[in-house]
Amino acid sequence: MLQYPHINPVALQLGPIKIHWYGLMYLLGIFAGWYLTRYRAKVKPWAPIKPEQVGDLTFYVALGVILGGRIGYIIFYNLPYYFHNPSQMFFLWDGGMSFHGGFIGVLIAFALFARKIGANFFDLGEFVAPVIPIGLGAGRIGNFINGELLGKVTDSPLGMVFPTGGPLPRYPSQLFEFFFEGVVLFSVLWLVTIKKRPRYLVLGLFMFLYGYARFICEFFRQPDPQYGYIFFNWMTMGQILSIPMILLGAVILIAVFIKTRKNKCENI
């Protein structure tokens, strides 16, 4: 059995002000995304934005992630609770963010920013997609430190007793998602960007691989208590929300493959 590290969710306290690791992980993900996107804007001749525009894009994306992630969590996962406890909607440090809601928020942010600078929406998505897994991985570390989004009870050697999860060992599902949705997905997308490739290949890969990784990792996560299993006595809300991403990613990849076969797909 693995040993839980017992990290205090509060990284720093200055009088009544508490700085949580959960928030710091989001800040780390946003900063790393800004740094790598700015680097890519300098070295990629096809970049749809200039290096000096990356700061503004990061601001748009950060708002999309925070607002979309929180609103998505409230709507998709716990609407009745927040309906009766509206003040709790603003307690972000207690956790409660939805990737799928954040993804929708980022799409809206991309659309607004692309319109502002006169860029192509899909080119912007293709350009930013390789750095998104960094934020995903950082967020999962925040979930782990918070002791939330717990895994299922297990007798596997990978089990871990969480202080918030009772006396039985559970899968550290947050670390599984950190590895597959963060480390593996970033590595794959970054390697693909090193060489010339068909336009929108990375965008399609991101959507398909993230949706697939999330769908599989959900089998190790405890279902959300307010929903449990929604279909077939095994499908969770996270899996349901991942299916559209898998399908849309597959459609993009098929379209890229067809255009490549016909020599009509531009390489970048």
Swiss-Prot record:
Its main location: membrane. It is an enzyme of class 2 (transferase). GO terms for molecular function: phosphatidylglycerol-prolipoprotein diacylglyceryl transferase activity. It is found in: Cell inner membrane. Pfam families: LGT. Pathway: Protein modification; lipoprotein biosynthesis (diacylglyceryl transfer). It is a multi-pass membrane protein. One of its GO terms (cellular component) is plasma membrane. InterPro entries: Lgt. Its EC number is 2.5.1.145. The chain crosses the membrane at residues 14-34, 57-77, 90-110, 117-137, 174-194, 200-220, 238-258. A 1,2-diacyl-sn-glycero-3-phospho-(1'-sn-glycerol) binds at R140. Belongs to the Lgt family. HAMAP family: Lgt. PANTHER family: PHOSPHATIDYLGLYCEROL--PROLIPOPROTEIN DIACYLGLYCERYL TRANSFERASE, PROLIPOPROTEIN DIACYLGLYCERYL TRANSFERASE. Catalyzes the transfer of the diacylglyceryl group from phosphatidylglycerol to the sulfhydryl group of the N-terminal cysteine of a prolipoprotein, the first step in the formation of mature lipoproteins. This is Phosphatidylglycerol--prolipoprotein diacylglyceryl transferase.
